[in-house]
């Protein structure tokens, strides 16, 4: 395994390159720089060899949100809806950089993320056909209007595999929006399965902040199998 790092389009990229040619390329968006921990967890789980591109997203509320939504709390930050602009950078600059550096040609590209990045991973499927496998771990499917968006629009290409997961305590809250997370995740899982997409849904123990790296690795592992 060889690791290469660069800052491109304002984002820190870490590319863990497979030794073999023509291995899959997994694109993983992280809140800060936890990509290496997720990659090491994948290795511990004896995951099939892959190229792993970790992208640290620092303007999380903007770049991972598909449209504007108010803050979840009085002191919180609003979601400003910059996902389309970020996706353009991903497709036009970041992915070409990674593709030039892997051995051979990726057998497939998958996209994965946790929390708001899990929502972005699904959103991207409606905007581009580059990715053929997608995983949203503890995805922010409480996001206002997202469930409806998924049902009212068509993916650019139906994925070969789709993975969703959530912690069993994540919806145990009085917050009127956040408490819809498990219900919305399960409803979307049922909807995607009805489209004939090979889907897996996993209910993990704990709240939103428990075993994050392990949950991410489990989801990515499903894409690689």
Regions of interest found by a model, annotated:
Residues 1-24, 50:
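A domain-start/cap signature at the N-terminus of enzymes
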Residues 22-101:
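Serine-hydrolase catalytic machinery in alpha/beta-hydrolase-like enzymes
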Residues 28-30, 137, 166:
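Alpha/beta-hydrolase
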Residues 108-113, 137:
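Short beta-strand immediately N-terminal to the catalytic nucleophile in serine-hydrolase-like folds
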Residues 112-117, 121:
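Gly/Ala-rich beta-loop-alpha elbow adjacent to hydrolase catalytic centers
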Residues 123-127:
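Active-site signature of alpha/beta-hydrolase-fold catalytic machinery across serine-
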Residues 130-142:
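A conserved short beta-strand
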Residues 141-213, 217-224:
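The feature captures the conserved acid-bearing segment of alpha/beta-hydrolase catalytic domains
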